[in-house]
Amino acid sequence: MVRSKRQMRLGLFVQAAGHHVAGWRLPKAEAGGENLALLQRIAATAERGKFDMIFLADGLTTAKDAHPSMVARLEPLLLLSALAMSTSRIGLAATVSTTYGEPFHVARAFASLDHISNGRAGWNVVTTSYARSAVNFGRQHPEHDERYAVAAEFVEVVRGLWDSWEDGAVIKDKAAGRYVDTDKLHVLDHVGNISR
C-alpha cells in the first residue's frame, strides 16, 4: 500500500491592528490595516514563507468597545486586489456576507479578483450574526434559520453566475471583430426567494 504524501496547508489571518488587543502598542509593532505598503510586505513575506492563503475577515458594523481590528479595516476585496499585484502564488480569501450582499455584486467582485490574481480568489461565506449590522442597511436582522436559508440560495446563485460564462468565452478575434463568443454566454434563469 502506497501512502499519499500529506501536507499541511497554512493560512495567514491578517488583522488590521494585530490579533492581541494591545499588540499594536508594542514599541516595534508595525500595525496598520490601512497601510497598503505594510500589508504588501506582509503578503510577500507570507508567500516567501510558503503560506497557501491570506485571509481577511470582514464585518458590517462596529462598536466603540470593539477590538481595534474590527474598527480600522479596509474593504477586503479591494484590498486583496491590491495585494494580488504584489504576490503571484498565495491564495487571497475574504469574508463577504450573504445576508447583506447581493449575489450579482458578490459574483462579479470575486470573479474580478479571480481574474486579476490569476485564479487565487477565495470566499469565506458568512451570514452575519451581529444584529446591529442591520441598521447600516435599513433592514431588520433576520433570524438564524432564515439567514442560512438565504445563504444556501445566495451561494447557488453566485455559482450559477460564475458558470454563466464558459471557459474560452473571451476570444478577442480582431479579424472577425468579435471580442466575446456570445454562444458561450448564458443567462442565469434563477427564480427563487432572494433573486429573480
Stretch-by-stretch model annotation:
Residues 20, 63, 100-102, 131:
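Generic structural signal for helix capping and beta-alpha/helix-loop junctions
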